[in-house]
Amino acid sequence: MANVSTATVSRVLNEDETLSVGDETRQKIWQIAESLDYKKAVRKLPNRKILLIHWYSQQEELDDIYYQAIRLAMEEHGKKKNLVITTLYQQIPTELEEDIAGICAIGKFSDGQVTQLKKFEKPLVFIDSNQMSNQADSVTVDFNYAVQQVMAEAAKYETIGFLGGKETTQDQKQVLDDPRELLFQAALMQSGKYNEAAFYTGSFSTASGQALMNQAISEHGDNLPTFFFCANDAIAIGAMRSLQDANIQVPERVSLIGFNDSNVARYVYPALSTIQVDTEALGSIGLNLLVERMDGNVGITQNISIATRLIKRESTKK
């Protein structure tokens, strides 16, 4: 044996640098420990608290499973990292609890709100809102690539329309342009297929999608575009309902592509072609970035852009 006290053995195995003991004794203690298959105990790190600020109310989140999926992914990923996540719906606190280690903000926030959040001087990451101009980290969807995928499909059609929605920031102070609409419009202009009269904007709901397509059918009649890009699946499903009510065949007469690949997209009839957004990646990558900030491992401000994928189903021609 090493002929030392239990306390000395413990301090050597815990690598206590303040302990005054010879190298030979240290080596002997480690040799004996290894022969006994000693494994150093891993200290459990204390749970760190994260504040998740949601731009929606709880009811609005129930109506929009896109943002619900992001939040749930963050909570599940947080458990694996010993993070305790508290969600505040549709509000920004005036002050923070001292033990809050970082903040994640989901949704769309005005410049004033971003400034308000930055004043807490805590690690801060925005999900689904590019805040590079405000010098804040963010994780967003790559809309450029998504629209390229839609355009590759739209190229098969001569007449093309768009059904979209308008959003405002959580405090209602800024109206936000939808990048899907702007990018799609620019791409159609470049291809010579842009028709301003075939672009319709309402809200991001099934009811709005149905109303917008009703309007398009009324205004265009037999010249109704043969292809519509819809800014989310809810709009596309509402549009499909309108077409079916008017006895207009999908996709034989009109093809539709949605956005997000929500859970219901595959179950409507015909099953909806859509751009798939990895909401789990948005949530988990956002949380990873926040933890990196909390650990001091990130230097410059970052925006991480998540790729999308076109899921072809029965609402577009083969």
PLM feature spans:
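Flexible loop/turn connectors
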Residues: 218-318
